[in-house]
């Protein structure tokens, strides 16, 4: 690769340069685990090396300008390949990237390199990024979440239990005033948060400024009546970064505690800009993962959500939707809890049974609160409390607004169910075994909860799991 060797034109096998089984990864390398499905006749070593090359310094032919740089210093290296158990012709290729390949503090640049061109590569039938190890040296170039779990609890003055939320439905079509009314009723009934749906931005039936004003009124009215701090996730997502920041500025001027962003459709550059604004101005930031299933649903191609979750923790967000394990949206228990730990904890050990391919130290990057949302109702409360623990937001949209008596009773039912589960857990009871009994007993003292129990006693969303190891 040095100029003195002389330049020899032509196409050579990637594995001669980029497959290095003897390489010991450095502490400051970014490590990636790819699930590779090569085309028939392509050896796994060549496929793994091709991934390393095309996502770092390589191109399809030898170029004479290779002689002007130290390829050994900058190239990605495929350092290990292992077959995937139970799958024919699938391999996990481990690739190490030198840190100098990436711009500091830019998730955008990291993804452009690692998953940019290589996913359209002809030698591969399919390719999936299963996990990334982000070294502390790179992590420290990111601000991360605007505030993190502990600061959020201090701002809200809420401790020792999960937080309760509700997405306002119907998601599209309400006028701003009716929307604000639904927000008020839910918050007044006992919820901590209400939420704009991900596709509520600024449409003809409800412009963003009107919605912000009516929701702020609902927040302050419910706060003064309950003595609790309340919030509504005001969706600041917009067509341009400038417009998004303008909406966040208006939210700050109204004095509300939290705004929201759709981080995948909005993009990582916009998300990181908003996260910086939120930290500088005391706003919490709720993140919705709209579009994630386009990227992470296929088992053999795309990017696993645990990578998107890590990227969000780096880019910045205080809450992110993370599946439910029990509702209508997909999420397998061990795998979901794997990326929930990656969002919340300071240090996560490698654990292949939960899909965690690398030990991940987060140094002092604040944590993100996972949000369980999608098809959940009061009967799920014991399971959700046990699975997600205190540092979570449990979000019941239809499970609040679908209550036969209205929005406020729906909120009250959820709050009573949650308080009953937390109390039972603190007394040492087994929520998994005794959950239904705990809810039934609580419903004797809460007519709202009793009505909710009756409505949703038969509802189940049971389909085969897609996300298996």
Swiss-Prot record:
Q: Where is this site: Transition state stabilizer?
A: 328
User: Per the UniProt record, which EC number(s) apply here?
Assistant: 4.1.1.39
N6,N6,N6-trimethyllysine modifications at: 8
GO MF terms listed in the record are: magnesium ion binding; monooxygenase activity; ribulose-bisphosphate carboxylase activity
Superkingdom assignment = Eukaryota
Q: Which cofactor does it need?
A: Mg(2+)
SUPFAM superfamilies linked: RuBisCo, C-terminal domain (SSF51649), RuBisCO, large subunit, small (N-terminal) domain (SSF54966)
Cellular component GO terms held in the UniProt record: chloroplast
Q: Spell out the post-translational modification annotation for this entry.
A: The disulfide bond which can form in the large chain dimeric partners within the hexadecamer appears to be associated with oxidative stress and protein turnover.
Spell out the note in the miscellaneous section. Answer: The basic functional RuBisCO is composed of a large chain homodimer in a 'head-to-tail' conformation. In form I RuBisCO this homodimer is arranged in a barrel-like tetramer with the small subunits forming a tetrameric 'cap' on each end of the 'barrel'.
Question: How does the record describe its quaternary structure?
Answer: Heterohexadecamer of 8 large chains and 8 small chains; disulfide-linked. The disulfide link is formed within the large subunit homodimers.
Q: What is this protein called?
A: Ribulose bisphosphate carboxylase large chain
């Amino acid at each position: 690769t040095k100029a003195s060797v002389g330049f020899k034109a032509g196409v050579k096998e990637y594995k001669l340069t980029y497959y290095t089984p003897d390489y010991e990864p450095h502490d400051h390398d970014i490590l990636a685990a790819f699930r590779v499905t090569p085309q028939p006749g392509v050896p796994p070593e060549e496929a793994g090396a091709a991934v390393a090359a095309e996502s770092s310094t390589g191109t399809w032919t030898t170029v004479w300008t290779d002689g002007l740089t130290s390829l050994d210093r900058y190239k990605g290296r495929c350092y290990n390949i292992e077959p995937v158990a139970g799958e024919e012709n699938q391999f996990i290729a481990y690739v190490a990237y030198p840190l100098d390949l990436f711009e500091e503090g830019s998730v955008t640049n990291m993804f452009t390199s690692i998953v940019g061109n290589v996913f359209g590569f002809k030698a591969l039938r399919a390719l999936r990024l299963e996990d990334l190890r982000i070294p502390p040296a790179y992590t420290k170039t990111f601000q991360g979440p605007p505030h993190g779990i502990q600061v959020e609890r201090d701002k809200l003055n809420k401790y020792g239990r999960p937080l309760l939320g509700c997405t306002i439905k119907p998601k599209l079509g309400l006028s701003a005033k009716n929307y604000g009314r639904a927000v008020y009723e839910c918050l007044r009934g006992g919820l901590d948060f209400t939420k704009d749906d991900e596709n509520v931005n600024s449409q003809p039936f409800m412009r963003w400024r009107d919605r912000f004003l009516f929701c702020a009124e609902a927040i302050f009215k419910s706060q003064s009546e309950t003595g609790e701090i309340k919030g509504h996730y005001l969706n600041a997502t917009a067509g341009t970064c400038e417009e998004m920041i303008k909406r966040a500025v208006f939210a700050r001027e109204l004095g509300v505690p939290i705004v929201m962003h759709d981080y995948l459709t909005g993009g990582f550059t916009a998300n990181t800009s908003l996260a910086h604004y939120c930290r500088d101005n005391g706003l919490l930031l709720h993140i919705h993962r709209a579009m994630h299933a386009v990227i992470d649903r296929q088992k053999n191609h795309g990017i696993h959500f645990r990578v998107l979750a890590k990227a969000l923790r780096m880019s910045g967000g205080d809450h992110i939707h993370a599946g439910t394990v029990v509702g209508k949206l997909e999420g397998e228990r061990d795998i979901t809890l794997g990326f929930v730990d990656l969002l919340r904890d300071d240090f996560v050990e490698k654990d292949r049974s939960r899909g965690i391919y690398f030990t991940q130290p987060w140094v002092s990057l604040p944590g993100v609160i996972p949000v369980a949302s999608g098809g959940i109702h009061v009967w799920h409360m014991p399971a959700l409390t046990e699975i997600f623990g205190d540092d979570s937001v449990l979000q019941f949209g239809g499970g609040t607004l679908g209550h036969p008596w209205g929005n406020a009773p729906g909120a009250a039912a959820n709050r009573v169910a949650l308080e009953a589960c937390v109390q039972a857990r603190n007394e040492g009871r087994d929520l998994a075994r005794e959950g239904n009994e705990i809810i039934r007993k609580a419903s004797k003292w809460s007519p709202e909860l009793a009505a909710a129990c009756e409505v949703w006693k038969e509802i189940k969303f049971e389909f085969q799991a897609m996300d298996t190891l």
